[in-house]
Design a protein with these regions (language model features):
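Glycine-centered tight beta-turn/hairpin loop motif at sheet-sheet or coil-to-beta transitions
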Residues: 50-52, 77, 100-104, 121-125
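N-terminal glycine/threonine-rich, aromatic-flanked beta-hairpin/loop signature
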Residues: 47-92
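Tryptophan-anchored aromatic micro-motifs
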Residues: 28-53
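Membrane-interface motif at the C-terminal end of an N-terminal transmembrane signal
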Residues: 18-31
Length: 168
């Protein structure tokens, strides 16, 4: 009888522990809030530079339980609005976002790696991932931003938009 009592207590503890974990996960808001960042490795350009795009995503919870997604991309010396900006709804570990252009895209969260996988691809066809922006990794993000700007300002990477004219 004692064996069954101990086994019952263990099973009850496991069930309660799982319930508490699920409740905590639901109440903590999950990954869909705050600022997240990552780097898209876009490949080599014609001058041999490794081209990278700094991706920053800000998730904001709305009163109607939707999530506003603000996607920004550091492309060269300019930060532009990204193609993933829009409004999303949580679906389990995923966020289904309707972008401003009306396209539906999916963001996936991995509880193991603690990263969000974006519907963007690196040059090697692997998915682009982002991590939460913290005080500890903010300097890393800003260093990458500086490298991207510096590479874009190299003379061989400038795009000449002037038209040449020849005199006959």
């Amino acid at each position: 009888m004692k064996k069954y009592s101990i086994l019952g207590i263990i099973i009850l503890a496991v069930i309660l522990g799982g319930g508490v974990f699920a409740l905590f996960s639901a109440l903590s808001g999950g990954p869909w809030e705050g600022v997240w960042w990552g780097v898209q490795e876009a490949g080599m350009n014609w001058s041999g530079d490794n081209i990278r795009n700094l991706e920053t995503i800000t998730f904001t919870r709305n009163d109607d339980k939707t999530i506003t997604v603000d996607h920004r991309v550091q492309q060269g010396s300019k930060e532009v609005e990204g193609s993933l900006s829009g409004t999303g709804a949580i679906d389990g570990g995923r966020l289904i976002v309707t972008t401003k252009t009306g396209r539906e895209v999916t963001f996936s969260y991995s509880r193991i790696s603690k990263l969000i996988e974006l519907p963007l691809k690196n040059a090697d066809k692997t998915p682009v991932t982002v991590k939460p922006l913290t005080e500890e990794n903010n300097n890393d993000m800003e260093e990458i931003r500086s490298e991207i700007v510096k590479i874009s300002q190299k003379p061989e990477n400038k795009i000449d938009t002037t038209l040449s004219s020849t005199k006959s």
